[in-house]
């Protein structure tokens, strides 16, 4: 079936088959990335722009490496050093990028829906690299890729616990939408004010405490607290108190299955949602996630370029 769309805006709109297509395509690029020479010329003569209106380490660097390994010309755009500071709108910025015959725009923006807005107003393909609290599809795809790599099945036999600031996490939303397509059992746990008001749409179990959240899990995804998106509506306890009730430590990880894996989209707040003895321990596959991000994003960029003809 493949993936035949111009843009990649979220996992909620993807079919199970389309998700599997990306995961299968990523295998080729994972193998390439393990070689001494990591480049190919699939995107030779193509131009990608990483348009980031928010700070990023892993996602922007990963997309840049992905594009360059595919042979594309890559430009990094940051809002703080652009005409955005002079009042230029997102619409005008996208139009100008398209006028320069850009093939793909990788967009990160603080406003939910920004990627869809941009995609409707440019001929370039748009990849949503995170729009507000809405979605972050490439992160969800690399998370699923990592699950498969560690022998976790994408079906009802796998239990995934997502713990932390779910209400403000675009990663959580994309992960949940993608996992639900496969019938994966998803459990959620967070402080009450960090559970989404519309959590029932996820059709997931909401746990009462960390012990219940970790019990019998195959995968635990930890999320940081996103105070920058809180708008003053979160009464944040001390880091020590948060860690006591909502942090993952070496005792709580023992409640999960013996071969459970721990994921985190980063950045990690050590000693808050995740203790170092877990982040650096045998259950952690966090750096493997980062590695897999390059392969998955290569698959995304290559697919969208092929769709452009």
From Swiss-Prot:
Q: Does the keyword Transferase apply?
A: yes
Q: What class of enzyme is it?
A: transferase
Residues annotated to bind carbamoyl phosphate: 58-59, 108, 136, 139, 266-267
Gene3D superfamilies named among the record's database cross-references: Aspartate/ornithine carbamoyltransferase
Which InterPro entries does the entry mention?
Answer: Asp/Orn_carbamoyltranf_P-bd (IPR006132), Asp/Orn_carbamoylTrfase (IPR006130), Asp/Orn_carbamoylTrfase_sf (IPR036901), Asp_carbamoyltransf (IPR002082), Asp_carbamoyltransf_Asp/Orn-bd (IPR006131)
- Entry keywords, A to Z: Pyrimidine biosynthesis, Transferase
Quote the pathway field.
Pyrimidine metabolism; UMP biosynthesis via de novo pathway; (S)-dihydroorotate from bicarbonate: step 2/3
Protein EC:
2.1.3.2
Q: Does the keyword Transferase apply?
A: yes
Q: What transmembrane ranges does the database entry give?
A: none
Q: Name one GO cellular component term.
A: cytosol
Which one GO biological process term can you cite for this protein? 'de novo' pyrimidine nucleobase biosynthetic process
Q: Which residues bind L-aspartate?
A: 86, 170, 224
- Name a GO molecular-function annotation: aspartate carbamoyltransferase activity
Its UniProt entry gives the catalysed reaction(s) as: carbamoyl phosphate + L-aspartate = N-carbamoyl-L-aspartate + phosphate + H(+)
| Role noted for this protein | Catalyzes the condensation of carbamoyl phosphate and aspartate to form carbamoyl aspartate and inorganic phosphate, the committed step in the de novo pyrimidine nucleotide biosynthesis pathway.
Task: State the oligomer form and interacting partners.
Answer: Heterododecamer (2C3:3R2) of six catalytic PyrB chains organized as two trimers (C3), and six regulatory PyrI chains organized as three dimers (R2).
Family label: Belongs to the aspartate/ornithine carbamoyltransferase superfamily. ATCase family.
Name by which UniProt lists this protein: Aspartate carbamoyltransferase catalytic subunit
Q: Which organism is it from?
A: Campylobacter curvus (strain 525.92)
Q: Which gene encodes it?
A: pyrB
């Amino acid at each position: 079936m493949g993936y035949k769309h111009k843009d990649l805006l979220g996992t909620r709109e993807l079919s199970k088959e389309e998700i599997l297509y990306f995961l299968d395509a990523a295998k080729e690029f994972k193998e390439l990335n393990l070689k001494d020479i990591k480049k190919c010329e699939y995107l030779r003569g193509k131009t990608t722009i990483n348009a980031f209106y928010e700070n990023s380490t892993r996602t922007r660097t990963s997309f840049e490496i992905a594009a360059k390994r595919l042979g594309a010309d890559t430009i990094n755009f940051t809002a703080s050093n652009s005409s955005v500071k002079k009042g230029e709108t997102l619409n005008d910025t996208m139009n100008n990028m398209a006028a320069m015959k850009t093939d793909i725009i990788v967009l990160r923006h603080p406003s939910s829906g920004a990627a869809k807005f941009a995609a409707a107003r440019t001929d370039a393909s748009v990849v949503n690299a995170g729009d507000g609290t809405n979605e972050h599809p490439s992160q969800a795809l690399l998370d699923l890729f990592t699950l498969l790599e560690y022998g976790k099945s994408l079906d009802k036999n796998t239990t995934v616990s997502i713990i932390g600031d779910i209400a403000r996490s675009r990663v959580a939303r994309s992960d949940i939408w993608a996992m639900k397509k496969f019938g994966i059992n998803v459990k959620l746990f967070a402080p009450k004010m960090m559970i989404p008001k519309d959590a029932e749409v996820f059709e997931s179990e909401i746990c009462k405490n960390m012990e219940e959240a970790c019990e019998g899990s195959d995968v635990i995804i930890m999320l940081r607290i996103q105070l920058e998106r809180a708008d003053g509506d979160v009464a944040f306890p001390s880091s020590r108190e948060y860690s006591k009730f909502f942090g993952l430590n070496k005792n709580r990880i023992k409640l999960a299955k013996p071969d459970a894996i721990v994921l985190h989209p980063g950045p990690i707040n050590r000693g808050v949602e995740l203790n170092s003895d877990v982040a650096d321990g045998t259950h952690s596959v966090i750096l493997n996630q980062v590695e897999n991000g390059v392969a998955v994003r290569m698959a995304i960029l290559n697919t969208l370029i092929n769709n452009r003809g």
